[in-house]
Amino acid sequence: MLKHPTLNLLQQLGLAGMADAFTRLADNDESDNLSHGEWLALLLDQEATWRNNKRLALRLRNAKLHHPAVPEDIIRRAPREYDRTILDLLIAGDWIRKHENCAIVGPTGIGKSWLACALGHKACRDNHSVLYVRMPALLQSLEQARGIGSLATRLKSLGAVELLILDDYGLQPIDGNAPHYLLEILEGRYGRRSTLVTSQFPVARWHEKISDPTYADAILDRLVHNAHRLEMSGESMRRLRQPAEIQT
């Protein structure tokens, strides 16, 4: 079967969304009743949708979110105790546009990482670049980058992402070169980008997790000063969910 010349042109121009819509409309007898303007409007709408979906898929892939979490699922999960007003504010996402930070704290297994990933997913849908990383792994990778001479490049890339999710703050001591790395990240992001941190330790104990008090003061000033704080409590999700849904 020969292709319609218009379909060939759409494909040659890389207008995949319009090409797909053209094929479906051409196969639909009811489309004969549409005016030229209505045809064009439908094709353009499908192209815009296709491009938006493609960009979203790319942002989600680059975000490397640890959990397939979305904010719409929050109310369907096991009961949690938290400030709903703060959670609604975080989901709305204005804090990211204002380059503010977020701290989510609570006991192990409460679902902090899952919630952070849900907020990350929403940020991707809001056209923000996102990156999820566990803090112990991040600090280790920065030490390795220093060893091969790519530390500056790595720090620059971390400074560019619009929402950086640092999971498991304080799980391991922040010592050696780690305080310097963390300060460099936050200094470059403060007032320019947003950082979301999760921790099983209350914010009041974050200072003691950093070996150098001077660095600790500087780090927390940039991290906590403009942060929205969400404290979670409740039963561990590890006791409530099957292994495939284990949370941290």
UniProtKB/Swiss-Prot annotation:
ATP binds at residues 106-113. The keyword ATP-binding applies. It holds the Pfam family IstB_IS21. GO terms for biological process: DNA replication. Transmembrane segments: none annotated. One of its GO terms (molecular function) is ATP binding. This is Putative insertion sequence ATP-binding protein y4uH. The keyword Nucleotide-binding applies. Keywords: ATP-binding, Nucleotide-binding, Plasmid, Transposable element. Belongs to the IS21/IS1162 putative ATP-binding protein family.
